[in-house]
Amino acid sequence: MRLLGRLDQELSCANSRFFKQLLYPNPQINELLRDQFVLHWQSVRPVPIVTIDFGDGRRIRKTLTGNSVHLVLDPDGRPVDALPGLFSPGVFLALLTRAHGYALADRSKLPELHRQALAQPLPPSAYRPPAPPSEPRAVRASMIAPTKHMVEMPVLRVVSPLSDIEGDTRTNLALHARIHQAFASGAQWSSVDAMVERIYEDLFQMPLDDPALGLDVPDPFAA
């Protein structure tokens, strides 16, 4: 896995924290990862962290942006698939199982296997329909004043709990389809790192060589 921040620290990117809470403890996922994969994680760069000071001595520290990707390599260390972002446990298990098959298949058949995956996407039964997420009270209060809500919303989203795993799953399945398309077209990368850089730049819209990761947007209300 490649991620912003460190997997062994509390404040890694939000997705990786949910991997540890929702995915890795799942008995089926845990068994598959333990028995069929050689596990490795690597930080691509530090994750941005924001501190909110309440003015009375209390502070909250949260990560502000970031994403992660699970790479599946064949026995020779060549990528055969990549699972971008967070998925529900059922979908993650299905994608991992399929990617494990890619890793053991004849390399010459890899484009065709990805074409088949594009033609046969996971059925809707693989993940349950999402329930509309309930906005936290701080978000609802901010929306009463729409102008200041535009300024506050990025930080409010950061400190609000993630509640739409199924929504993330749908979004990331669409990103994963683009990875299928790349492999199906015979795309080649000079290295695993080169593939990771393309994923962060093209899929996550987060070039790793951007010093601010897109966070240096001018404040429209600054004097």
What is the predicted role of each segment?
Residues 93-223:
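Non-globular targeting/processing and membrane-anchoring segments
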Residues 3-4, 25, 122-123:
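Nucleo/cytoplasmic regulatory scaffolds in medium-to-very-large eukaryotic proteins
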Residues 17-81, 89-99, 149-190:
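Thioredoxin-like thiol-disulfide oxidoreductase module
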Residues 1-9, 13-14, 39:
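Short active-site neighborhood of thiol/selenol oxidoreductases, capturing the structured segment around
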